[in-house]
Amino acid sequence: MIKISASAVHRIKKCAHSAFLESSMPREWQYRDGYKQQAERGTAIHAAAEDVLNAAITGLSGAKITALIKKVCKTKLKEYAFDDCFYTIKTYVSYVLKTHKQADKNWIDTDIAVEEKHRKTILGCDMVAKLDASIFCFANFGFYIHIFDLKTGYIDYEATAYDQLRFTALLLSLLFPKNMDFKGFTIHTVQPLYYDATKQIITHTEQITTKQARKELAELAEFVKTGKCAMGSHCRFCPCVLGCKSVNDLVDFINSNEVENMDMSRLEYVYDSRDAIDAFMRACEGKLIEFADRGESGKYEVREKSGHKKWKDEKAVEKSLRIFGDGIYGKRKLLSPAKMEKFTSDDLSALYETPKVKILVKKENVFEVLDFHPIATDQR
């Protein structure tokens, strides 16, 4: 039996439905046309998932469940992308069944492998989710903690796995009581990490004291405020998780003694790479701006959105004008060289936080390399 305070249950249930809707909408709708289309799509997928689950728990084989999901996607959800619907429903159903050991083991194992292959469509993990949507449960089937990808395309992906686990553990250690029985929990990280992420996160959580968690989160908050790592080296915790606009709320939370009163929405940081690039373009229009940091290869890395093809030829980069950086999804556009003029540091205030990127600024014919650490703002 999972022992958890009533207020904590309320917090989790409160964001359960919105989390499902948030996770099941396509990126192009996010923050664009409001939540109407998102809600319609999410509600439809959720209802279909419940229908499949109700049929699955009667004892259907894995093959029949898969066939049923395909049928539902092609009939009830035919106006939406098949892959998005199929893998969202399959993930939901498989994890619920797995928790209760009611599913064909081979089917579940196959499903986990499929998740890794298609992680960009699983529960919308190609988006950066709000923190208030990072923990939710399906009330009838026990708790299911889904930690969305807390990193953005602007963060170095290669060495973030441990830190994502650690950050998750820090949050959980404050959200739940110290005598928490995590039996029955599934913690699913959509980053291509490990299959034993649940065990590692719970181990971290059980070992972290409240004092230690607050200290580490305070260091993170300090890093977000100053753009410098308070721990003495570049912090790989994603500063975009909480956002500069929420630092004061975070600090208040860390310093508060009444964790039960925490409102998860206060830590909300809404972020979409397209919005960031829109803001970037508005701030840079008609001004000189180019990326100076090209990484170890000394070349820009550019990818088309479809197929993620890479170019390392600078002329091709200038021609395509899409600078992608280290992210996985989306594309970044720069102005054509013909439009490059002057760019001043004042324009940085309108840009989003983009760690580990440098820009080349021209001031009265003098080029200066600046760290690109502008203030995070809500551009919507």
Feature annotation, model-predicted:
Residues 107-222:
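Mg2+/Mn2+-dependent nuclease catalytic core
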Residues 211-275, 367-380:
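Short, charged, low-complexity amphipathic alpha-helix
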Residues 25, 53-57, 152, 169-177, ...:
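Hydrophobic/aromatic-lined pockets within catalytic cores
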Residues 272, 279-380:
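Extended, charge-rich alpha-helical segments
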Residues 1-141, 186, 274:
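Metal-dependent nuclease catalytic cores that hydrolyze phosphodiester bonds in DNA/RNA
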Residues 27-36, 57, 154-157, 178-179, ...:
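Short, polar/flexible loop-turn hinges at active-site or ligand-entry regions and domain interfaces
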Residues 44, 163-171, 269, 275:
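Short amphipathic alpha-helical face segments that pack within enzyme cores
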Residues 29-31, 147-154, 261-269:
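Glycine- and acidic
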